[in-house]
Swiss-Prot record:
Protein name: Ribosomal RNA small subunit methyltransferase A
Entry keywords, A to Z: Cytoplasm, Methyltransferase, RNA-binding, rRNA processing, S-adenosyl-L-methionine, Transferase
Alphabetical list of CDD domains matching this protein: AdoMet_MTases
Enzyme Commission no: 2.1.1.182
Binding site for S-adenosyl-L-methionine: N18, L20, G45, E66, D91, N113
Function: Specifically dimethylates two adjacent adenosines (A1518 and A1519) in the loop of a conserved hairpin near the 3'-end of 16S rRNA in the 30S particle. May play a critical role in biogenesis of 30S subunits.
Database matches in InterPro entries: KsgA/Erm, rRNA_Ade_diMease-like_C, rRNA_Ade_Mease_Trfase_CS, rRNA_Ade_methylase_Trfase_N, rRNA_adenine_dimethylase, SAM-dependent_MTases_sf
C-alpha cells in the first residue's frame, strides 16, 4: 500500500500534506479547542476532515479554508458537513480575517493542522489580524512550537518568539509523534494555543519598528547588539534603556524589544 494515499487521496508534497489519523490525538485537540455552537470557528487546511468532522458535529456552521481543489470538493459533498460548511478554496495567506470576523459579527476561533512548509509565514499573516481573533489552536512542527514558547537565553528564542509573544499568550497543549499521521512526517509535531492579548502587557506604538529591530538583531544573532543594532542605537543609548550592549539578540526579553521599538519611534535614527 502506498503510505502517501489516505482515504483515496494522494498526499501532495507541494501542499505539505500529512493527514492526522490518531483518534486519541484528534479527541485531545478537539477538547482543547472546546468549540461551542454559535461561535465563529474557522479551520485552516481541513484536509480529509479529521478535525473538521468532530468539530463540525458540535457546530451549526463553520468555515474552512482549503487550497487543494480536490479536498475542497470532497468537503463540499461530505454527507454530514456539506450543509454546515462555508468553504473558501484559496490560500490562507490571502484571506482577510478581519473581513471574515466582521461578517460573523464576532472574533474568530481559528484552528488547523498547518502545512509545515508555510506555518511560519502564515503565523505572521495571522498576527496582523489578532484584533479579529479570539484564539488559535495549531498543530505545528514541534521545533516551531518550541520557538513560539521559548524564553530569552535559549537557542529556540528568535524573532518568531518575540512577535508571537508580543501579540499573544502562547501555551503548549500536547506533543504528537510522527506515527499519528499518514504519511508520517520526518519530524515530531505539537499543538499550541495562541490567545491574543486583550490588553497588551508591552504596548508598541509602531509594530513595524518592532519587526525591523527584531529582524535586524536576529539576522545577526551571534553578534552583540552593540554591533547588530549599531546603526540604530549607540552603546550609551542601549545602556540608558537598560540593555547591556554586549548582550546578543537571544538575551533580550520581549519587553525590552518593545522598549527599544518605542524609543526608536520617538527618536528616529539619523539616515546614513
Amino acid at each position: 500500500m502506498n503510505n502517501k494515499v489516505h482515504q483515496g487521496h494522494f498526499a501532495r508534497k507541494r501542499f505539505g500534506q500529512n493527514f492526522l489519523t490518531d483518534q486519541f490525538v484528534i479527541d485531545s485537540i478537539v477538547s482543547a479547542i472546546h468549540p461551542m455552537p454559535g461561535e465563529a470557528v474557522v479551520e485552516i487546511g481541513p484536509g480529509l476532515g479529521a478535525l473538521t468532522e468532530p468539530v463540525g458535529a458540535r457546530m451549526d456552521r463553520m468555515t474552512v479554508i482549503e487550497l487543494d481543489r480536490d479536498l475542497a470538493a470532497r468537503l463540499a459533498n461530505h454527507p454530514q458537513l456539506k450543509d454546515k460548511l462555508t468553504i473558501h478554496q484559496q490560500d490562507a495567506m490571502t484571506v482577510n480575517f478581519a473581513e471574515m470576523a466582521e461578517q460573523a459579527g464576532q472574533p474568530l476561533r481559528v484552528f488547523g493542522n498547518l502545512p509545515y512548509n508555510i506555518s511560519t509565514p502564515l503565523m505572521f499573516h495571522l498576527f496582523s489580524y489578532t484584533q479579529a481573533i479570539r484564539d488559535m489552536h495549531f498543530m505545528l512542527q514541534k521545533e516551531v512550537v518550541n520557538r513560539l514558547v521559548a524564553g530569552p537565553n535559549s537557542k529556540a528564542y528568535g524573532r518568531l518568539t518575540v512577535m508571537a509573544q508580543y501579540y499573544c499568550n502562547v501555551i503548549p497543549v500536547l506533543e504528537v509523534p510522527p506515527t499519528s499521521f499518514t504519511p508520517a512526517p520526518k519530524v515530531d509535531s505539537a499543538v499550541v494555543r495562541l490567545v491574543p492579548h486583550l490588553v497588551n502587557p508591552n504596548p508598541v506604538g509602531d509594530v513595524r519598528m518592532l519587526s525591523r529591530i527584531t529582524t535586524q538583531a536576529f539576522n545577526q544573532r551571534r553578534k552583540t547588539v552593540r554591533n547588530s543594532l549599531g546603526d540604530l542605537f549607540t552603546p550609551e543609548q542601549l545602556t540608558e534603556l537598560g540593555i547591556d550592549p554586549i548582550l546578543r539578540a537571544e538575551n533580550i526579553s520581549v519587553a525590552q524589544y518593545c522598549k527599544l521599538a518605542n524609543w526608536l519611534s520617538a527618536n528616529p535614527a539619523p539616515q546614513q
